[in-house]
């Protein structure tokens, strides 16, 4: 897999990309009971083949740790530092599109209560999917594109072109299929 260095022209696109990643195959967990005062944790789940992407994100966010499970190639990039959680929440707030925003709102309530963060809950994003990097993050999390040729191209012949990696480009927000 080729790893490219990414150029971020605005932090805003990073937030859309992170929101897409979390909504695609990530989670925000808020502890309850006696552990409620501990900061929430953000977890991105991925396959070991995607390690360069998450190492790059870890470097960009300057926080977190990566866990590698012994079986199945499953990995998790976890962010649990309170200041880093607040930083990520500020990046992704207002950029969610799915019901996972409920977990984001619980995390905002938690950091507002225990860290005096004073973060407002922004509404769901309704902008066009081609206006930002959200879709790139969502597809990078757990997606692929397929093209099936049938009919006049061959009745029994079909070919699939599957996404190996959607590369996010912050400047143009274009997905490149390889």
Where are the model-predicted features located?
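Internal intein/HINT superfamily modules and their associated LAGLIDADG
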Residues: 1-178
């Amino acid at each position: 897999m080729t790893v490219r260095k990414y150029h971020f022209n605005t932090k805003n696109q990073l937030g859309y990309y992170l929101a897409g990643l979390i909504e695609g195959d990530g989670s925000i967990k808020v502890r309850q009971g006696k552990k409620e005062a501990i900061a929430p944790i953000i977890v991105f789940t991925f396959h070991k083949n995607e390690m360069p992407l998450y190492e790059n994100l870890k470097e960009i966010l300057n926080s977190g740790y990566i866990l590698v499970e012994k079986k199945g190639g499953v990995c998790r990039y976890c962010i649990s530092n309170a200041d880093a959680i607040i930083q990520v929440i500020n990046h992704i707030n207002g950029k969610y599109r799915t019901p996972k925003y409920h977990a984001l709102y619980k995390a905002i309530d938690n950091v507002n209560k225990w860290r005096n963060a004073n973060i407002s809950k922004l509404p769901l994003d309704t902008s066009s999917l081609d206006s930002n990097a959200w879709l790139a993050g969502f597809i990078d999390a757990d997606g692929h594109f397929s093209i099936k040729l049938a009919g006049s191209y061959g009745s029994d012949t079909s070919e699939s072109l599957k996404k190996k990696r959607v590369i996010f480009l912050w400047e143009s927000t274009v997905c490149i299929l390889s």
